[in-house]
Amino acid sequence: MATYQVRLINKKEDLDSTIEIDEDTTILEGAAENGIELPFSCHSGSCSSCVGKVVEGEVDQSDQIFLDDEQMSKGFALLCVTYPRSNCTIKTHQEPYLV
């Protein structure tokens, strides 16, 4: 099983942490396992509470049903159903910027 370095950043939240997450663990679960509290609601990819923005790297969010193609092309990802597929950097707490 592959493990990736995932950097979670957000200046307003004073967050800049790099954690290891297995390929079969969601970003949200991995953050929680490492003591990082991120916003969430449904845990099923059907709302936008946990949305983040992938700044660098690759992820798999094929289980999500909320974001449209344009939002995903801008890097938005629902962290409750997003799995790392490479080392990556993700801006957290992005729901206010999801238009």
Curated annotation (Swiss-Prot):
Gene3D superfamilies: 3.10.20.30. Binds 1 [2Fe-2S] cluster. [2Fe-2S] cluster binds at residues 42, 47, 50, 80. Keywords: 2Fe-2S, Electron transport, Heterocyst, Iron, Iron-sulfur, Metal-binding, Transport. Ferredoxins are iron-sulfur proteins that transfer electrons in a wide variety of metabolic reactions. GO terms for molecular function: 2 iron, 2 sulfur cluster binding; electron transfer activity; metal ion binding. Belongs to the 2Fe2S plant-type ferredoxin family. This ferredoxin is expressed by heterocysts and differs from the ferredoxin expressed in vegetative cells. Its cofactor is [2Fe-2S] cluster. This is Ferredoxin, heterocyst. Signal peptide: none annotated. It comes from Microchaete diplosiphon. SUPFAM superfamilies: 2Fe-2S ferredoxin-like (SSF54292). Residues 4-96 form the 2Fe-2S ferredoxin-type domain. Disulfide bonds: none annotated. InterPro entries: 2Fe-2S_ferredoxin-like_sf, 2Fe-2S_ferredoxin-type, 2Fe2S_fd_BS, Beta-grasp_dom_sf, Fd_pln. One of its GO terms (biological process) is electron transport chain.
